[in-house]
Structures are given as structure tokens and as C-alpha cells.
UniProtKB/Swiss-Prot annotation:
Annotated Pfam families: Peptidase_M17, Peptidase_M17_N
EC number annotated for this UniProt entry: 3.4.11.1, 3.4.11.10
An annotated GO cellular component: cytoplasm
NCBIfam families: PRK00913.1-2, PRK00913.1-4, PRK00913.2-2, PRK00913.2-4
List of catalytic residues: 270, 344
Family: Belongs to the peptidase M17 family.
UniProt name for this protein: Probable cytosol aminopeptidase
Species name: Caulobacter vibrioides (strain ATCC 19089 / CIP 103742 / CB 15)
Cofactor(s) needed for function: Mn(2+)
Source domain of life: Bacteria
Places the protein is found: Cytoplasm
One BP annotation, GO: proteolysis
Binding sites annotated in the UniProt record for Mn(2+) 1: 263, 340, 342
GO molecular function, one term: metalloaminopeptidase activity
Length: 493
């Protein structure tokens, strides 16, 4: 799909849909009023007969009445009665696209506000709504295929709007990259392939280094390597660097991602029902790769590190067993009670490596870590755990701004008893009570004096069904927007 910015007097044409806004109570925007007048009040009559109220995200899609150069007209509700906020424009553009994407029209003309920032945000919403992962489909009914090939956004100054869209386009590219990683089947996206795709981002100016099992063994990463020892696919540690600050020696920020490219549970094997979804157990690593893509794509003025721990958790004769004891890079020993609590074992070494090598300002890890977070928070919030109030507040604010919501949960020392082991320094699981919290407490043992936050994104990495028009069913790309906003608002010089 192609994005174009066009003058405000552009007509939709015979094969296009026109989208305009309506406020709460079905009050028409200036663009909608003009369309209504051109049709002799036909839009107002359609509203009266269609129970359209102008509620946020509500759409009314009709065949274009006489008087308009268009095939269809889409009214999109945005609530309120005054100025339309950028978020509302983004959602309205996405809703309009969803309303007509398979209607047969080949163009969608968005007249949602003429200033450059509004037009840019509309383009961003449409771009995200157009995401579709169907590369392996060889047959599909024509009426189910997306027909919209071009989205034209009306702007008072199309050149200025295009300029305003550039950083959002870079962010959209990064979100799509992350969604594609999560959507790929595990026979395609194994650790080596994931690492290769990360390496491909060097074209954006990133530096990418890949450590294999031999290098990790020399570093003493027994915790991470134990997870992957049952797979024929070699585990990988990917280090991504973006040095965008004026001072290249300035202390970087760091993101660490869990990348279990497929999780059978290992010897503690999962039930067959739903196991296919475990292809997205690398959603944390996909988010980290995505935010590094975004920072490089928009040339962010910050030094940033992304570290991806990539493994497959498979059961074979060489697989890790319940009861095994492994030694992490930190020197701490771990009794593996359950091989399906593997993500924290990967992160233990990845976190330690990151802080020891790069001495970052802070570390944020992202992981589809626990099913317990879904029980706690449902599918609208990710869990936030942190040793630093300031970092937590910045993350919460960024999440609210980008509709990637977080809820902070505690890390009470009293719960550490649940992960005590009689034969090692700790065990990797603490039982059913407070499962997300004890997982966070486990990770905290591998953080040595660095401000740190852990985002448990198991609840939000995959949405089906999705209620957000910018997130089609499936991979969300959760974390890319959130962390990009965090950097832009708080850490760019």
C-alpha cells in the first residue's frame, strides 16, 4: 500500500472512498459538512437512518450519493466537539481503512484535518491498519483480498505533511518488522534466521554482532545455553548498537529481549492444544529488534544497545532435565525445576552480559515470560516490574501516550522464599502463587546496581481478536511504540 499527501481540494474519484469525521452527536467536521452540502444533505439523512452517533471509532460506510466524486463515503466518529487530538486522528484513519479495505475501492482519500501533523498521524494510522501477514497463502477468494492500494491524505501543505510523516514512517517500518518476526512460523524463524534478519538492519546504520554457542560458552552462559541444548538449532546472542548521540562515548541505554523462537516447554512439555502459538515466545526480542530499527530509522540522537537472547526450547535426548543445576554468567547457580520456565534462564545471562559489557544508564527487558500475567492483568496491560521509581514513571507515561499500557506490580523481598533452592543459589520457578512476581524477583538477582525494568508482555504480544483498528488480529509489535516514545521524550540529547 502506498501513502500520498495531496492538496485539500483533491477529489476521491470513481474508484475511491472518501473518509471524513463526525463528532459526538453526529456533528459533522468541516470536511464532512462540505460533502453533505454537495450531496444535498444525503450524509445527514444517512446518519439519521443509520444510528450513527459519532462515538470514537464508529464508522458509517455508504455508497457515495450523487454530487460527490467518489465510490463510497466513510464517516468516522471521534467523540468530542472541539479540536481533534492526534491519537483520535490516528484511530479514525485506521478505522476508515478497516471499513473499506476489502470493499473493492482501490484508493482511500482521508480528509481528517489539513495541518501537517494531523495529516502525518492519519497516514501513520492507515499504514498500521494495513498490516497483513499472508505471505504463505497461495489461494484466497478475491472478495477477501484487500483492494486498497493507495491512501491519499489531504493536507494544506503536502510537502510539510510528508516531512512530518518521516519519523512516523520509520516507526511504522519498525513495527511492521517486529510484527513480521512474531508472525513467522518457527520452522522459518529459528535463532539463526532471526539473527540474520537483525544483521540485515545494518543497512540502517546499526552495528550488529552475533555470538554463537562457542563464544557464549567461553563467557560462562550456562543458563542461556542450557535452554537451547535440546535443539538442533544453535542458540545465538545478538548485540545491536545504535550510536546516534553527538558524544559516541556517552553512556548508552539498553534493551534486552527474550527470544525463544519456539517453546515446547522442553522436557516439562506443554499440552498440544495451543502449542502452535508458542512461535511468538520471541516477542520480547522482536520488540527490542523493532525499537532498534526505529531508532536507527529516524536517526535518534541517543546511544542505544539491544541484546537478543535467541534459543529454541525443544525436548530431545540432549535436552535439559528438571532437577539440573546450571551456572549462569554471573556465577550464581540455578536449579531448573521446570524446563518450561525457560525465558528467565535466557534473560539471566543476557542481562548480566549487557550490564557487564556496556555499563548502561538503565536496562529494560521485554519478555513473554508468564501466563500468570494474563491472569493478573488480562490482555490490555503488560506487567511492569522495576527497581527504580523514576524509570517506572517514564515508562508508564510513555505507555499511556502510545496506548501500550503498563501496570506496575511489586517485587516484595518476602516472596524470594518461593525461589529458594536447597542445592543451588536459587530455583527457576516458585510455584503458582504470584508467578509473575517471583519471575521478576528471579531476574532481579541478575541486575547489579543498574536501574532496571522488566516488562512481562505475555498478555499483549498477540491479540486475537483485536479491538484496536491499528492492530489487525495477530502480532501487535508491542513495545516498539512504547520504547521509542520513552527514548524520544526522556533520553535524546
Amino acid at each position: 500500500m502506498r501513502i500520498e499527501f495531496v492538496p485539500v481540494d483533491t477529489q476521491a474519484g470513481a474508484t475511491a472512498a472518501l473518509a471524513v469525521l463526525a463528532h459526538e452527536g453526529a456533528a459533522l467536521s468541516p470536511e464532512a459538512r462540505a460533502a453533505n452540502e454537495a450531496t444535498g444533505g444525503a450524509l445527514a439523512r444517512a446518519i439519521a437512518g443509520g444510528r450513527f452517533t459519532g462515538a470514537k471509532g464508529q464508522t458509517l460506510d455508504i455508497v457515495a450519493p450523487n454530487g460527490l466524486e467518489a465510490a463510497r463515503v466513510v464517516l468516522v466518529g471521534v467523540d468530542g466537539s472541539g479540536a481533534v487530538e492526534p491519537e483520535a486522528v490516528e484511530l479514525a484513519a485506521a478505522s476508515a481503512f478497516q471499513a473499506v479495505k476489502t470493499s473493492g475501492v482501490v484508493e482511500l482519500v482521508l480528509k481528517l484535518g489539513a495541518d501537517a501533523e494531523t495529516a502525518a498521524r492519519a497516514a501513520f494510522g492507515a499504514r498500521l491498519a494495513a498490516y497483513r501477514f499472508d505471505k504463505y497463502r497461495t489461494t484466497e477468494k478475491a472478495e477477501k483480498k484487500p483492494s486498497v492500494q493507495v491512501v491519499k491524505i489531504a493536507a494544506a501543505d503536502p510537502v510539510k505533511a510528508q516531512k512530518a510523516y518521516e519519523p512516523l514512517a520509520a516507526l511504522a517500518d519498525a513495527i511492521v518488522f517486529s510484527r513480521n518476526l512474531v508472525s513467522e512460523p518457527a520452522n522459518i524463524l529459528h535463532p539463526e534466521e532471526f539473527a540474520a534478519r537483525a544483521k540485515g538492519l545494518e543497512s540502517l546504520g546499526l552495528e550488529v554482532e552475533i555470538l554463537g554457542e562457542a563464544e557464549m560458552a567461553k563467557l560462562g552462559m550456562g543458563s542461556l545455553l542450557g535452554v537451547g541444548q535440546g535443539s538442533v538449532r544453535e542458540s545465538q546472542l545478538v548485540i545491536m548498537k545504535w550510536m546516534g548521540a553527538a558524544d559516541k562515548s556517552a553512556q548508552p541505554i539498553a534493551f534486552v529481549g527474550k527470544g525463544v523462537c519456539f517453546d515446547t516447554g522442553g522436557i516439562s512439555i506443554k499440552p498440544a492444544d495451543g502449542m502452535e502459538d508458542m512461535k511468538w515466545d520471541m516477542g520480547g526480542a522482536a520488540a527490542v529488534a523493532g525499537v532498534m530499527h526505529a531508532l536507527a530509522g529516524r536517526k535518534a540522537k541517543v546511544n542505544a544497545i539491544g541484546v537478543l537472547g535467541l534459543v529454541e526450547n525443544m525436548p530431545d535426548g540432549n535436552a535439559q532435565r528438571p532437577g539440573d543445576v546450571v551456572t549462569s554468567m554471573s556465577g550464581q547457580t540455578i536449579e531448573v525445576i521446570n524446563t518450561d520456565a525457560e525465558g528467565r534462564l535466557v534473560l539471566a545471562d543476557a542481562l548480566w552480559y549487557t550490564q557487564e559489557r556496556f555499563k548502561p544508564q538503565f536496562m529494560i527487558d521485554l519478555a513473554t515470560l508468564t501466563g500468570a500475567i494474563i491472569i493478573s492483568l488480562g490482555h490490555d496491560y503488560a506487567g511492569l516490574f522495576s527497581n527504580n521509581d523514576g524509570l517506572s514513571e517514564k515508562l508508564l507515561a510513555a505507555g499511556k501516550a502510545e496506548r501500550e499500557s503498563l501496570w506496575r506490580l511489586p517485587l516484595p523481598a518476602a516472596y524470594e522464599k518461593q525461589i529458594e533452592s536447597p542445592i543451588a543459589d536459587m530455583k527457576n520457578i516458585g510455584g503458582r502463587p504470584a508467578g509473575s512476581i517471583t519471575a521478576g524477583l528471579f531476574l532481579q538477582k541478575f541486575v547489579n546496581g543498574v536501574p532496571w525494568a522488566h516488562l512481562d508482555i505475555a498478555s499483549v504480544a498477540w491479540k486475537k481478536p483485536s479491538a484496536d483498528p491499528t492492530v489487525p488480529d495477530g502480532a501487535v509489535g508491542y513495545g516498539v511504540r512504547l520504547l521509542n516514545r520513552l527514548v524520544a521524550d526522556a533520553y535524546e540529547g
